[in-house]
């Protein structure tokens, strides 16, 4: 039987080494490494984008925006300090609050026009027409005299102050009839109606009937009357 040639030992060792290395790489579990690497890459991308956005805003802030400039103060010929509007003419016409506003005035404002503003005339109720005299009448007609309203007390006549039931009337001070009377004497003061006691000050004229009616309205009964 012929003898089979034997391979040298060097070649046999060279073939067994790659097989052992391949078996070692296959045994290492690399499955969980892929999700971990994807998570780290996503986190890195998030930080890079956030840094870029913050840096862009930080460098843009020192540069003023021409469309959002601060309003300028202008002195008008009338001695008024005005805020110059920043919007266009069309925007000011559409926005009522975008018009110029006076801040300081060196003089008094102009008196209002007799007719008022356009909005006031449009919203005002129609005026009541006053009757005009006929052209045939030749007698001059004078307007009725209206007594001037005064805030001070004055003696009123019976026509001006009609007596009303349930109301309280106040007695005002009257001048002394005689100049020679001394101040504080009983004759210098007006006496109450139906009483001998002088009227020393402003006191209401209240009758028992008015007091009883008041308590009846309040749902109570008067005691001692």
Curated annotation (Swiss-Prot):
It is a single-pass membrane protein. This is Transmembrane protein C16orf54 homolog. One of its GO terms (cellular component) is membrane. The modification Phosphothreonine is found at residues 113, 117. It comes from Rattus norvegicus. It holds the Pfam family DUF4689. InterPro entries: DUF4689. The modification Phosphoserine is found at residue 195. Keywords: Membrane, Phosphoprotein, Transmembrane, Transmembrane helix. Signal peptide: none annotated. Residues 107-149 are annotated as: Disordered.
